[in-house]
């Protein structure tokens, strides 16, 4: 497998688990929580770090804003060995009980974006992996973090409801 065109990674550069923030600086910040972090690559909005967390190889790659650039990262990361990916970063909420800093753990998504229909028909439900959701809930409980579980909505217009 060759070097990936956009993320500039090759097999062995990434852990099986990858965090996907939109912002390059957030990727750098996340890497500071890793043991032995190393900067793997930078290309356009894609900034990649790999290290270890609790002796497990993990990576973080910034995706830029939106589903189209995130899909580039996901496709190329899979080609070089990533298997578990979690999008982290900005979201909004309409419920008054959701506060800044609360975690949102998506159990499913209403797809209102233009990218996901390129992968699968809109009639197919976008439901999160149960085991991954359970692991996120367990971790949030262990940390004492405030979190909310539920169905999210994704779409292309950042400031539109």
Where is each model-derived feature located?
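Metabolite-binding pocket within alpha/beta catalytic cores that recognizes anionic/polar moieties
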Residues: 1-134
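Active-site rim beta-loop-alpha module in soluble metabolic enzymes
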Residues: 126-161
């Amino acid at each position: 497998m060759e070097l990936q065109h956009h993320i500039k990674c090759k097999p062995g550069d990434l852990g099986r688990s990858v965090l996907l923030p939109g912002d390059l600086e957030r990727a750098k910040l996340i890497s500071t929580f890793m043991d032995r972090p190393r900067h793997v690559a930078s290309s356009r909005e894609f900034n990649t770090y790999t290290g270890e967390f609790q002796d497990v190889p993990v990576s973080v790659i910034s995706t830029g804003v939106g589903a189209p650039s995130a899909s580039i990262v996901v496709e190329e990361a899979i080609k070089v060995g990533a298997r578990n990916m979690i999008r982290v970063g900005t979201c909004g909420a309409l419920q008054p009980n959701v506060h800044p800093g609360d975690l949102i753990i998506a159990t499913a998504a209403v797809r209102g974006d233009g990218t996901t229909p390129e992968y699968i028909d809109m009639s197919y439900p976008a439901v999160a992996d149960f085991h991954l959701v359970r692991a996120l809930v367990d971790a949030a409980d262990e940390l004492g973090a405030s979190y909310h579980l539920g169905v999210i909505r994704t779409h292309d217009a950042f400031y539109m409801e």
